[in-house]
Amino acid sequence: VRFLMGHPELEVEGIFTHFAKSDEEDKTSAYHQLELFQNFIDRIQTELGLTIPVKHCSNSAAILEMPQANMDMVRAGITTYGLYPSEEVSKDIVPLRAAMSLYSHIVYCKTIHAGQSVSYGGLFTAQKDTRVATIPVGYGDGYPRSLSGKGYVLIRGKKAPILGRVCMDQFMVDISEIPGVMEGDKVTLLGVDGTERITAEELGELSGRFNYEFV
């Protein structure tokens, strides 16, 4: 700071810190970090006479549960998508609603017979005649390969499980239990269809990731 003040061509516009543990139920560490930050700001003003115009440290978790940390500005990240930063953050203070949905469509439908396999490696082999739909989305688009054989999509308000591996630019789902499905039908990868819902939190749990990676 003394170096900056010794260079009049440099103008200090702001200062910030970023909480490491504000998304945990126990806020002891976060409050300690806030205290250190505030003490540093006070020292700059008291000892050096420098008043910093903009001070900020609140991320999404702090915005929700640490209002005393909001200072001059806040950084709403995951909450701008209507999602909570962790399961330990209270959902009662500010009710959020997911703001993001992700859709695709069916490009191909076919029936495979018992003993036939789907996708790379033949990880899924049909035990009976199975109706299969192809979705033109894959890990090249950011849809996790780790959802292979675990995830599902929504078609006509019903769940359609992923069959076999998610490929680079497509994956296949089981539509055997969904009557009338045809090419061009809307597919919900994230969001609501009828009474069913796929959340970023659920996709995170199924894929071994977390909701941030889906938005």
Language-model features: where?
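Active-site loop/helix belt of alpha/beta enzymes
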Residues: 1-105, 109-113
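C-terminal accessory subdomain/extension
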Residues: 111-215
